A protein has these predicted regions:
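Asp-based, Mg2+/Mn2+-dependent phosphohydrolase catalytic module
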Residues: 1-12, 38, 84-89, 110, ...
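N-terminal helical cap/lid subdomain that shapes the substrate entry/recognition surface
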Residues: 2-110
Length: 235
């Protein structure tokens, strides 16, 4: 039997907070392009699967450097809408990498985190720019967490095991008693499990529905999973 989960670490982006698309996509709107939610959801799913393939080596890089998930996402979006403008792409990538632009929060998130916090100690591990705590404060959920581990401050990004080790140390938590909740398989799931933790994906757009990996699509589903024999995929 697996040890009981005592600590839950959360990713932030696309797990608890979501991008302010209106602000980030202002350069597109100025040029008459307003991508709808369904297009963006579909592109996120496709980009995650391609990015995971590159990160895990199942898709070759074809000699080109990997510029990161959002570089891939916006390169593809601009290609699909017929806007060939590297400066716009770079502006979009810089904007979405600014943690201050991740301030869209689902209704009920704070209440759900408080409920989870009544049963588990909760913390954050985020690839960010050193300012994610400020954003969590602004969104009203920073006090839900015992510790916040920001890659911009600790010097390591997921999936590097050191960022997970530092977060575990900050919580005095054993990896086998800790669960990580994040949204990208190759970065969050493999990073956490590689550090000895258990993991489950927060798969809001449904990118991993047919991939056979542990996943939920909301904090409500996570609570149900946690109450069902220590979670469907977190064991």
């Amino acid at each position: 039997m697996s040890p009981k989960i005592k600590v839950i670490f959360f990713d932030v982006g696309n797990t608890l907070l979501f991008p302010n698309r209106e602000r980030i996509h202002a350069p597109l709107a100025e040029r008459g392009f307003v991508p709808d939610a369904e297009r963006l959801r579909d592109l996120e799913c496709r980009t995650k699967n391609r990015f995971d393939g590159i990160m895990t080596g199942t898709i070759p890089k074809n000699g080109s450097p990997d510029h990161g998930f959002w570089w891939m996402f916006y390169s593809q979006l601009l290609s699909e809408i017929g806007l060939d403008d590297d400066a716009v792409r770079d502006q979009l990538v810089a904007s979405i990498r600014n943690s201050g632009n991740w301030d869209t929060i689902r209704p009920g998130t704070a209440d759900q985190l408080h409920e989870i916090g009544e049963r588990y100690r909760v913390a954050v591990i985020s690839n960010a720019d050193g300012k994610i705590e400020d954003v969590l404060l602004r969104c009203g959920i920073a006090r839900c967490f015992h510790t916040i581990t920001d890659s911009g401050l600790v010097g390591y990004e997921k999936p590097h095991p050191e960022i997970f080790r530092q977060a575990l140390k900050s919580m005095n938590a054993a990896p086998e008693e800790s669960l990580y909740v994040g949204d990208v398989y190759s970065v969050d799931y493999l990073g956490a499990t590689g550090a000895g933790m258990r993991a489950i994906l927060m798969d809001v757009p449904g990118a991993y529905r047919d991939k056979g990996v542990p996943r939920v699509e909301s904090l409500e589903e996570l609570q149900i999973a946690l109450g069902d024999g220590e979670s469907r995929g977190a064991t």
